[in-house]
Amino acid sequence: MRILLNGKWHVVLEDGTTGQMDLPGTLDENGIGHRDVGANQWHPDAVLGNAAGEIDKDAPIATRFTRRHTYEGEARISRKITVPDYGTDRLFVLAERARALRLLVDGEVCRVFRQGTLSTPYIFELTGAAPGEHEFTFLSDNSYPGMPKAAICYSSAATDETQTNWNGILGECSMYTRPQNFIDSLRVYPRAVKKEEKNKAGGYVLDVCVELAPGAKEIYKDTKIVLQSEALAAGELENTQTLTEIISCSGEGLTEAG
């Protein structure tokens, strides 16, 4: 199951400003925020037309393009969401392309399944939430509490001269389910084997590293993970059958995830 959370959300800023915004999207795009004027100028020595070199906080900024709306701080982005019956599965919310982000459900902080970054999605786990209507609230903060703000804001990912320090969620925003146990990551490392160590694979081995998702409750025994590719199916690689046998691995060595 996957449900997109696109649509209208209610927004409240720290100064009490309220509005409606569409997700995916930013406060700027939805006309929420303040005028982009001299008070937001990062370079006090820049030409602003100010007498005696003093900064006029209401003066236009002459050194870059300005935004119609700007805002730095926490934005509460809320909406009523109906959680369907998800049986024995686990329930997650994914928010992609966001700044510092937290999720509340009915006022309670949700557990972070995977911490996001400016370029990777946040994933929150809601397993245990009862089916029915709940209030979801994203706390989106582009002042980066607990993060290296200066390093972020002076990089091309957030300066007003480049991508701007927007606030919102620009990528996918969805709610989805997964089985109680699922593979969280799978890494394959091809390597050559020394001549004296060559085996029936003809000198090449694929090392496979499998990690179960955190919170797995039961461990499957005698599980086989088989990697397939067009090259294998088409017989373009030598020793295709042997390779297929090697890259099938037993799950006996899997241990419970934390």
Task: Name each model feature, range by range.
Residues 1-57, 139, 143-148, 168-170, ...:
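Accessory carbohydrate-binding/adhesion or oligomerization-edge regions at the termini
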Residues 3-5, 9-15, 67-183:
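Accessory beta-strand-rich segments of carbohydrate-active enzymes
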Residues 55, 60-63, 67:
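Surface-exposed, low-complexity/disordered Ser/Thr/Gly/Pro/Asn-rich loops and linkers
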Residues 121-127, 242-251, 256-258:
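Exposed aromatic-hydrophobic patches
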Residues 132, 146-147, 218-220, 251-258:
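Short glycine/proline/serine/threonine-rich loop/turn segments at secondary-structure transition edges
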